[in-house]
Amino acid sequence: LAATALLAAVKRRGGEVRDGVTALKLRSGGVETCEGFLHCDAVVNACGPWAGAFSEAAGAPIAVLPRRGMLLVTAPLPYAVRHKVYDADYVGAVASGDADLQTSTVVESTRAGTVLIGSSRQRVGFDDTIRVAVLRAMAQKAIRLFPMLAQVPVMRAYGGFRPYAPDHLPVIGEDPRVPGLWHATGHEGAGIGLAAATGQLLADLYLGRPPVVDPYPFRVDRPAVLKREGDGS
């Protein structure tokens, strides 16, 4: 719903949405897409977990990688989980830079009565295979917090990729290496919640207005993010 609302706001302000169009590379005065050249003064790399790949194609690589996560959704049940609950391991997993699998408990109910059970983190490129062993580990940890979940059937499971930056901060701002290229990525699991504020900050910077927050921690040319020629990180 949040993404739908943001998209509607873009359209109300004159924005155009082109479904199924892939940006291939930057050229002077715009961007080359699978449907031809698109003229523009600025290109925003908001490609999420694919932001690192696009930055390579744009000639300004940044260290943003996909970090896979999975989630379980239970069948609807009477209102039992009244607040979002997570264990202490969750904070450590979010802040970790380890590429290996990490699971930590997050349990949250929805208005429809289903319960969301997470979470996992693992850097495996874009391998989107759903791993039963990972789902089982998440379920077992959730049952320790809420034993009644042991009797609740799982309705579905799904996974996705978070855009991971090595220092765990978003990448927001103009790229100093390529004029007209801007980045808005690296939020990992907080992207949808920070989307509106990120757009506001990016607009402030582009238009030369006083920024809504200090942009310095999110700058593109910080050591953890900027990849230079010959850098294999």
Question: Where do the PLM segments sit?
Answer:
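Short acidic/polar mixed-charge low-complexity motifs
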Residues: 34-37, 113, 190
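Short hydrophobic core segments
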Residues: 38-50, 54, 199
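Helical element adjacent to the flavin cofactor pocket in flavoenzyme catalytic cores
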Residues: 1-41
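Helix-loop-beta segment of a Rossmann-like dinucleotide-binding subdomain
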Residues: 1-13, 120-124, 179, 185-187
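General beta-strand structural signal in soluble alpha/beta enzymes
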Residues: 17-19, 45, 64, 183
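General beta-strand recognition
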Residues: 30-32, 115-116, 171, 182-183
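Active-site substrate-recognition segment that forms the wall
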Residues: 47-176
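C-terminal catalytic lobe of FAD-dependent flavoproteins
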Residues: 127-233
